[in-house]
Structures are given as structure tokens and as C-alpha cells.
Amino acid sequence: MIIILFVIWGVIAGCRSEMVNKLRIVRIVSGILISGMSCMALADDSGVSLGATRVIYPFDSKGVTLSVDNKAGNPFLIKSVVLDESTKKAAPFVVTPPLFRLDGGQRNAIKITRTGGDYPADRESLNWLCVQSIPPEPDAAWAEGKKEGGGAKASVSVQLSLNSCIKLLVRPDAVHGNPVDVADKVSWTIKGKDITASNPTPFYMNVSRATVNGRKLNMERSYIPPFSDEKYSLPEGVMAKATIQWTVVGDYGEQKEKTVTVN
């Protein structure tokens, strides 16, 4: 399971008519669990976003690029790193530039280059490209010249630093096509209170949504590795016969719904 903690430090100023200069400070901390789903943008349309929901890295490639857009009115520092599937250690890739300033309304590109690693030649291998957008603190030297906006003039600023981790899939030459085209090969079986998804393909099957008899299937990680089985607990009240609807995500972020009946 991949867990990415997003930490939001917010400082909110509140004024009363009789106490104009008094601030009420509220500290907000929220954690968001990410379990192998396809990419989410760093922010919404007013912030920083990535140019793709995943990166497919050909086995012998000399490097791939990914665009980074800043739709906000202020600059961000962009910091990038590639981690292994567990997200506990660095993967054998370098990102250039690893750290740069991205002004508001501008676009830049990062290049991901493999530097080693013993990856299998018969299946995909999963890594994570993690990109962090760091907003300027008040009076930060690197942010000089930032565009004036509502946030820039606020007496108490809200600092927001977000991590976005998207899949970086190393794809060998022997693995061709798109996972959505072979998703029908995934089989589902029910035994007792568990349901098992079996993936006989060389692709990571990325699942954006799954239900059993219309009830949400809770998946610890929302993907099924190549040549692997994933076991989940059945939703409450589901018996041996069930209809499974699941949505697979393809190379370009496209989604395709599949329906399977298990007797």
C-alpha cells in the first residue's frame, strides 16, 4: 500500500469590529491516503498540474519528458524525485531539473532518465514519480517579482505544499499494447467472504472504481500487479453469486468499464 501524506498548514485571520487587530489562528492538518491510483494533479485549475496521469518508460529509453504547468498567479518551487513501488527508497532514475522555480502562468518540462535497475523483461515494473509544489513564504527571496494577486496581498497568507505521485511504469520491449485492451483477461472468484482478482497479463491493471452488486469494493491498493492475485473482503451482504463492475485505466488516462458475473 502506498501512503502519501499531504499536510496543509492554514492560518486564517479573523477580525471583530471592536478588536480590529486581533487575529484568530487556526491550524489545519489533513491527511489523504493514496493507494496506487492514477495520478491526481498537484492542484486544481488555479494551481500546479502535471501533463499526464502516468509515465510509460520504454525499457531502453534514454529519457522521457513530462510537462508541469503553473496556472496560479504566484511562483512555485517544483521538486521531483522517483521512488520505488514501496515509496520507501529512491528508484534508479534521475529527474532534471530536480528543483526549479515555475512562475505563474508558465510551463516547464522535467526529464526522467533511468540510471540502472534490474527490471524483469516479461512484465511492467512500477515506480512512482513524486512532484512537490512549494509556494513562497512571505518575503521569500526566491519569490521576488511574483505577480500581485489576492493571495499576495493577504495580511495572513495560507501556505500550501502538495505532493503528487503518479505511476512511472517501466515497460519492456516484449510488452506491447494498452492494458485496457486485455483487461477482459482479468478473472474474479468468490470464496467465503473474500473476492480475488487474478491478472494473467504483463500489465499493471489500474482500477479507478469497483463494485460488487452495486456496493463499493474497498481495495487496499487500486491496482492489480502483473501475473498476480489480489484478495479483497466482500462488501456486507454479498453472497456467492455477484455482478462485478470495475473500471480499468489505460495508458492515456482513458477509462473503460468492465462487467463480470461470478456464480
What are these regions (language model features)?
Residues G117-V175, K241-N263:
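Terminal connector regions
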Residues D44-S67, G177-S187, R221:
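Beta-sheet-dominated interaction scaffolds and their linkers
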Residues N74-V82, A141, S198, M205-A210:
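Short, hydrophobic/aromatic beta-strand segments
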Residues S46-S49, S67, K71-T113:
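Surface-exposed binding patches on compact interaction domains or structured appendages
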Residues F59-T65, D122-L126, K191:
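Short, solvent-exposed loop/turn segments enriched in Ser/Thr/Gly
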